[in-house]
Amino acid sequence: HYSNCSRYKQVIDGLWNSKILANKIEDVPFIPVSLFKSHELSSVNKEDIRSTMTSSGTTGQTVSKIYIDTQTSQDQQKGLANSLQHILGRKRLPMLILDTDASFKNPEYMNARGAGVLGMMRYGRSHCFALNKDLEPDLEAIKDFLKINGSAPFFIFGFTFLVWTKFHEILKNNNLDLSNGILIHSGGWKKMIEN
């Protein structure tokens, strides 16, 4: 980044007054995450950008932007697959998604959450969305999923705020056996702070 992003180089030189040699991840200098909102920090040539990841903008109107090239995208997918394999095993498990399919089917709703759901779906099979388009629990769909898949390991994925604000409530009020479920939750914690 230091060699390929002039703004990043300016920040590092301004904070540390010298070029830092980072031989391991622990040596990479920390920078305020807010810089990704206020500055275009990209070490990828514009023509090589495959996608741009954006934050949710929960703490303000301005979103952080991270520019991804093809190699980085492939590395991310391999890294995630390797990490999940240690948790979920080698076979794709039936997947209960604690979200609505509207989070990615409708371009109007497509955001970081929708992209996150789509990205995680490749690691599961026999997908079941636990929430309807109004983000209310679909108890019948959940019960049907558990009837078919609940006796063996299955994968549960959702964003933290939906796990606690929507799914946790339905668990308290219904006799659902999720003992074979493997829950992975991600992001959405800022929305919980608001509550």
Pin down the residues of each PLM region.
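Short secondary-structure capping/junction motifs at helix and strand boundaries
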Residues: 62-67, 85-96, 124-130
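Active-site diphosphate/adenylate-binding microenvironment
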Residues: 3, 7-10, 14-54, 62-66, ...
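Active-site glycine/GP-rich loop and adjacent strand/helix microenvironment
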Residues: 108-109, 118-195
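Conserved AMP-binding loop of ANL adenylate-forming enzymes
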Residues: 84-118
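A short, flexible beta-alpha/helix-coil linker loop
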Residues: 61-62, 102, 188-192
